Amino acid sequence: MSTPFVTTLSSSLYGLLKDRLEEKGFILTQPQYTIFQARSPSVMCTLYSSGKLVVQGKGSKEFIEFFLEPEILLTFTHNRVEADLRPRLGVDESGKGDFFGPLCIAGVYARDEETLKSLYKTKIQDSKLLNDAQILSLAKTIRSSCTYDVMILYPEKYNELYGKFHNLNILLAWAHATIIDKLAPRPSGEVFAISDQFASSESVLLNALKKKNTDISVIQKVRAEQDIVVAAASILAREAFITTMTNLEQRFSLKLPKGASAQVKSVGKSILNSRGKEVLSLVCKTHFKTFNEICDSASA
């Protein structure tokens, strides 16, 4: 029987952990002296009133490494698997959930063991776990050692494409497929690509790839950023988002907050009132419900 994993959880994370476990299909109960206990067929996760979190079960290793640490604890104390030195291509995006700014998609091709070993020696990890300064620094390292490509869809182009596709996942599939097609060797041989599974069905990306001139096989999985090549792509995509946001702010003399918070809505209203709907449309994603809420509030 494996030794249980024990850690202390900050009270600010109780709700997040509970919500994410429910999303993952865990059955929640509340035995005495606990805040909750969550069970799946292979994992039991118990959060005690003291804040002590205990994880056990045959699936606990994968649960900790691929969910608990990267998504909740934001640490990496669990042993890493052996470095994967298979040549491969990783692709990821940034800006998908941000009302203001572009959508940026990046691909990284690690063509040999030497390239992969150099990546493993760095502090490369999922860009969501890094600050802007770390991202900008690591991006230089990635560009110097890997083949890469970055697509930046400024809001004006993004809105045009969304009007064509009418679906964000189809737009993402087209963009990912375009990047993969540009970077994939021909013939692809044993090289494969890894992408985050952003749609409920893998067929969305596969159908987009069928329209391209590549025979490369693609692995789609949740939390693909756990792979170092996808993590490298996520860093280049985030770097592109950061620098493009700065360019937009300088071009329009505006301060554009990230995300989709109440502050974002407030800034959007200010831009609409002072600069008009046309300028607002040039710095934001107009299919977000936030856009209609801003416009409706101005006409009310």
Curated annotation (Swiss-Prot):
- Which GO MF terms does the UniProt record name? magnesium ion binding; RNA binding; RNA-DNA hybrid ribonuclease activity
Sorted UniProt keywords: Cytoplasm, Endonuclease, Hydrolase, Magnesium, Metal-binding, Nuclease
Report the co-factor binding details: Manganese or magnesium. Binds 1 divalent metal ion per monomer in the absence of substrate. May bind a second metal ion after substrate binding.
Catalytic reactions of this protein: Endonucleolytic cleavage to 5'-phosphomonoester
- Record PROSITE patterns: RNASE_H_2
Q: Does the keyword Nucleus apply?
A: no
Q: Which CDD domains match?
A: RNase_HII_bacteria_HIII_like, RNAse_HIII_N
What EC number(s) is this enzyme filed under?
A: 3.1.26.4
Q: Where does a divalent metal cation bind?
A: D92, E93, D196
Among Gene3D superfamilies, the record links this protein to:
Ribonuclease H-like superfamily/Ribonuclease H (3.30.420.10), TATA-Binding Protein (3.30.310.10)
Uppermost EC category:
hydrolase
Compartmental location? Cytoplasm
Q: Name one Pfam family in it.
A: DUF3378
Question: Which cofactors is this protein said to need?
Answer: Mn(2+); Mg(2+)
GO biological process terms on file: DNA replication, removal of RNA primer; mismatch repair
Role played: Endonuclease that specifically degrades the RNA of RNA-DNA hybrids.
PANTHER family, per this entry? RIBONUCLEASE, RIBONUCLEASE H2 SUBUNIT A
| Protein name, per record | Ribonuclease HIII
Give the gene symbol: rnhC
